[in-house]
Curated annotation (Swiss-Prot):
Species for this entry: Kluyveromyces lactis (strain ATCC 8585 / CBS 2359 / DSM 70799 / NBRC 1267 / NRRL Y-1140 / WM37)
TPR repeats: 277-311, 312-345, 416-449, 451-483, 485-517
Domain of life: Eukaryota
Annotated stretches, region: Amphipathic helix 4 (AH4): 225-241
Name assigned to this protein: Peroxisomal targeting signal receptor
Gene label: PEX5
Function: Receptor that mediates peroxisomal import of proteins containing a C-terminal PTS1-type tripeptide peroxisomal targeting signal (SKL-type). Binds to cargo proteins containing a PTS1 peroxisomal targeting signal in the cytosol, and translocates them into the peroxisome matrix by passing through the PEX13-PEX14 docking complex along with cargo proteins. PEX5 receptor is then retrotranslocated into the cytosol, leading to release of bound cargo in the peroxisome matrix, and reset for a subsequent peroxisome import cycle.
Residue spans of biased composition, Polar residues class: 94-142
Amino acid sequence: MSADCSVGSNPLAQLNKHAQQNPALRQVGYQNPASNVAQNFKTHVNEVSNANRFQMDQFMNRSPGFSDGQLGMAPVPSAILSHGPRFGLKKQDSGSSNMSAGDTAQHSRSWGNEFNSRSPQQGLASRVNNVERISNTNSMSSYRPGMSRIGRPMMHTGISSLHNYSHMSQQTPQMSSDDGVLADKQWNEQFEALEKAVAENLTMEDNKEETKEEIVVEDGYQADFQEVWDKLQAETADNNLETSDSQWEKDYARYMTGKATHIPPYRFDNDNQYMHNPNAYEIGCILMENGAKLSEAALAFEAAVQEDPAHVDAWLKLGLVQTQNEKEMNGISALEQCLSLDPTNQQALMTISISYINEGYDLTAFSMLNRWLDSKYPELTRSPTIDEANIDRFNLSKQVITKYLQVANALPQVDPEVQLGLGTLFYANEEFGKTIDCFRTALEVNPNDELMWNRLGASLANSNRSEEAIQAYHKALALKPSFVRARYNLAISSMNIGCYKEAAESLLSALSMHEVENVPITGSVVQSNNILETLKRSFVAMDRRDLLEKVMPGMDLQQFRNEFNF
């Protein structure tokens, strides 16, 4: 629809049609034949009787005799009239264009009071001044705030083009003087004001139609979103149905007892360029120290442990790498292998306890933390041995925390590892404030510990402090750019504050670090399921079904580089 077209019919013909259809207008002085409406107005308007004048006064002073419903008027909020071109209203402006009923009623009362507060002559003079200002402009495509005073049309009618109306208004009216009749100039100006008001009313109706179309489009988006969400839910349901009874029993044991009843064996990558390399372990250590991709270092350590299954340090390094690489269960499997060879390995005990907390095996984690403290400070932990086999979660947590506090108070200086263990215990009990205090104390001793910065970020995120968490994750990534888990956690916090595109970029960056040059992608072994599922959620939040359908194990990340920076 063009800027100067509305309903496609002559304005005065519409006025005539409305008068014929509305019984409230078919009274003395408002009978109007269907032929030559413009000429009728020009030649017979001078014959205004007292009854006609009373009806006109009712129009101009907004007498209660004519309600908005009778005249078919729609209130026009002034906020809309001051928002620029009529076709310039955008979806994101819906907050100003879609006013509530209460707001509309308030505007209606204020306009009514403004009209009623003036005498008929004062109201006419004000309207004439407004019309004169408007007539000086060359375009009707934009609205001005000043128009809000007469923004409510006096009748529900139509206007087809400015050309027809301007042609009629340029004719010299032939009126004879009569008692109580408006002067020639005043009548033309008033009629012009009414015609302008009619045009405004039609413009607002067009805007309403556009709003309806936008609502239909938004409903379509909502339907697409619901369809995608239902599909994801269905996939989850299918996966749950495929779960065996034994797996259900394992999950039950996990959530009801907090103990790890069965740890799956380590899943090795089938394509490993470091296999049969006698220096695989050393290569892995060099890759870690130089900030190479964790997935590449993992391949080197995998080759080392397959070459020598009793290599304790290789199992330890492999477990450390995989937990940082957002492959928790593989990391736990490697660390368990390390502990089976060296039950008092302190780094393995601390790392695996944190992994068990992440996976929900709290009792097993508390047991590991207790073992770590006994192995590190045996002289300070001579309290009675905890019966871990016959104790509930609450009491085990309480006793282990008490031991850690005793050791922390007995030490002459802060031990960051004791603070880490104590903070992990508080974290498991969702006492995140205490956790944050412990981790910050540890960072005061070692501010360049990227792992501790990541753990601090996780604690802040769980305390609903996403912005601070993001800062902590960025600090961890500044110290170690290949830290995949920190990128994953950063994506979670970004989603929590509505930054879905930034979250997707962090996740895609994390997935890209799972790729190793000259090694084909082999699906779930290489790419973390957690990252893939979170990436799907970010695309759903972005309402990007086209991208969602591309997310799958082994996908080519190059297809996302044109739109995302990673």
